[in-house]
Amino acid sequence: SSVKDKLNPFHLAIPVSNLEESVAYYKDTLGLREGRSSNKWADFDFFGHQLVCHVSDSINEQITNAVDGEKVPVPHFGVVLSIEEFEEFLSQINDKNVDFIIKPTIRFKGEIGEQRTMFFKDPSGNAIEIKAFKDIGNLFSS
């Protein structure tokens, strides 16, 4: 069985400075389906996982760590897609003025963990990574 067959939906709540702006970004820019919401939070179907944006006066500071020659933002969250899903998502956001931190690239080329990856920020500065392994079976391989 594949990794995807074993997964339960993950829940992640993130701070946002402006809920209306965040809802527009996650729906219109990233194409996510909005679920329930109030005037303080909104949840989204993030590739089968529950992402909740909560209004907050305090947004976390970020650092970067070097990974395969790139400055990767910490903290960040994201999803592992198939190569086909990665390409489809990339084509969906291609003309949406996404604020890339790391433009779509191949990381660890020729190694066990070879993957397509991209990093971008939402309007509140939350860093998001979308990636796809050349071989999903190597997700946890070293």
Feature annotation, model-predicted:
Residues 1-8, 33-83, 90-121, 133-142:
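Vicinal oxygen chelate
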Residues 18-19, 82-85:
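Helix N-cap motif at beta-to-alpha junctions
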Residues 22-27, 93, 125:
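Conserved active-site tyrosine of GNAT-family acetyltransferases
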Residues 127-130:
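Short glycine-/small-residue motifs
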